[in-house]
Structure formats: structure tokens, C-alpha cells
């Protein structure tokens, strides 16, 4: 009788789906994201973009520390010209898990980051081709960023990231608040 019960239990255990544990503390990940500023959605085509390379370290309860390097480029129209503004930013912060399903396949997080960077206006050239003089200068930037991020596991190691963020950057002669959307991929190891 014991042999029959053991065989039945083994059949039920073998038929269940085995899933890897996710969001383990001290698990690390590398991510690559594409950044689209909010202004990119108002026109039919925009050359404004950004990229981000990130590194994350999981903490407890689905929270994690996040560090990233970003490059952002935005074109400001002036007569028939486009004046490029490039931003090189380092970010570091913490992401808090707000809600997730029981298998941790889909999660919604709130992230807060400190930002530090440098802004280059028109490739450091203040004189425009028509003779006009730019009053905007290259500057160091500092600020903070807050955003909501949806993370979805494609497999036990790959995640798709979608987020909406708003950054407040001081030190720039351009706008203070900069909303953006990001889409990316993270590899957990």
C-alpha cells in the first residue's frame, strides 16, 4: 500500500511545473534600455533619444538597488537648424516593489534615483552658422528622478522593462523637469 501511495505522489509531483526562484536577494542583473523623451511622442518622427546601461542588485521583498549610465540627445529647433544638446548622466537609486503576481512574473515598482552628469550644447560651439551666438553653455547637472516600472520575466534570466519617469535636473539652462519613457531588457545572473 505504501508503494502505491508513493507512486501516486511521485506522479503528481512530476507533473507540476518547476519554476526557478526569482528576485532572490543579492542576485545581480545587467540591463540595456532605450529612452524616449516625452516630446518624441508629440511629433510623427523625432531624432531625440537616449540609451541606458544599468546594473542592479536585488534586496529583500523584490526591492533592488540600481546604478546606471545614460546618454541622452535632444535636438532643439532654431530657424532651419537643429541645435543638439547631449547629456551624459550617472544614476544611482533604489526601486521599491509595489505589487506583483504570486509567481513574480510581472511586477510594478517605484524607483527613486539621484542623478549627476554633464550637458554639452551644440558640440561646445557657441557660434551658429548664421552668425547667431548661443547663450546656453555646457554645464554640470545634478538632480533626482522618480518613476514607475513594469517588469515582466520572459524566462528565468531575461526580463522586459517598461517605465515612465520624470527627472528634475538643476544646473542646465534648459527645462527643469524632463519626462521620458523607457523600454529595455535585463539579464539576471
What are the roles of these predicted feature ranges?
Residues 33-38, 75-77, 129-134, 165-168:
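Extracytoplasmic loops and strand-loop junctions of Gram-negative outer membrane beta-barrel proteins
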